[in-house]
Amino acid sequence: MASLGAILRGVLRRTTPPHAGAEAVEAALRARIARPSDRAALRKARLVFHAGEAGVWTVDLRQGEVTLTRGRLGGPGATIYADPATLVDVLEGRLAGVQAFLDGRLFMRGNIALTLELDDLLHPAARDPRSPRCHRVSAGGVESFYLEAGERGATPVVLLHGLGATSASFLPTIWDLSRDHRVFAVDLPGFGESAKPVRPLHAAYYARWMVDFLDAVALPRANLVGNSMGGRVALEVGLRSPERVDRLVLLCPSMAWRRYRFAAGLVRLLRPELGVTPLPVLHRLVLGVLRSLFARPERVPDAAMNAAADEFVRVFATPRGRIAFFHAARAIYLEDPHGARGFWSRLPGLSRPSLFVFGDRDWLVPRAFLHHVGAALPSATCETFSDCGHVPQFEFPERTSALMRAFFLSP
């Protein structure tokens, strides 16, 4: 794996046309970021733009005032690295920031949501509808952050991330599906930029919140796509509120463990509120865990891996972030597999068309679950990706999006 320094040097040493030097970057910054939107004016934030040899600029937003300073000032909320030509293209609206990130032409460190809100600062004349717009809404009494992309009249799809992740874990899917769908990607309560209620975060709670979210964004019903824990949430919505769901796509969904429950007694004794105690985690350790989720981590851009690790470390550094993580992880492990309220006992009651996708090298949700799903839901469509880990939407983005699109259009 390339070092972080090597990655940044690669991004910043790209060929730069003469017109895209320091003067062009600063002019683009002044022209665009000096005129923030009303929403951006409410934010208190600091962004650093690093354009290699062309220079570094700091943008401060505070109480409606925006200042642009040459150089780096203190600790930023986020840093954006790109060669000058790419940065100018993004600032002037010729290139979407998400597209540049997915293509490896732009690198983000720090708060991913803050960098995604860059579009709210720019107001390009011709905005790509695939570029996600950042919003906040109250759902179930929780301030909830979400991304939205695509045309308003298109078929709605809601994307639900996994444990410890955020809406950014679906960026490739957002960019692809929003060509012909209206796509929402949420930060579930307790994660990312959404508020972090100190309470049990189990599938039933998230299903109720999901219905409230659909109400808040005026969606009578939608297709739901969930990865890992998000898949479990999507299933619960389908079981409890089928009238709000068109179709379900479950990407390596977490489901009640049928075995390996030997630690259940101990886990019940450990209270998530212990997360109030500081528990620092190292970026390199998080990066190692993230890489283990992929069959071949080299398929995923190093920039995306580092951005995801940054996001986890940032959220987990807060007491509420740690408590939320422990609450959600505890609920996953302790869910009853059998009995009147058991997951596998209830699953046959799922009435909505469902597509399950498993990775044959996923150590978190082994493909052996496929047989249990087939027995409980004979009508479900089940696919196994060979040489794939736990996050197919990043390891095989084109294949995953194509499969979803075909499933949404099937009779």
Place the predicted regions along the sequence by residue.
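Active-site loop/oxyanion-hole signature of alpha/beta-hydrolase fold enzymes
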Residues: R133, A139, L147, A185-M229, ...
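Short beta-strand/loop motif that positions the catalytic acidic residue
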Residues: L350, F356-F358
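Flexible "cap/lid" loop of the alpha/beta hydrolase fold
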Residues: L239, L248-P278
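Feature captures hydrophobic
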Residues: M1-C134
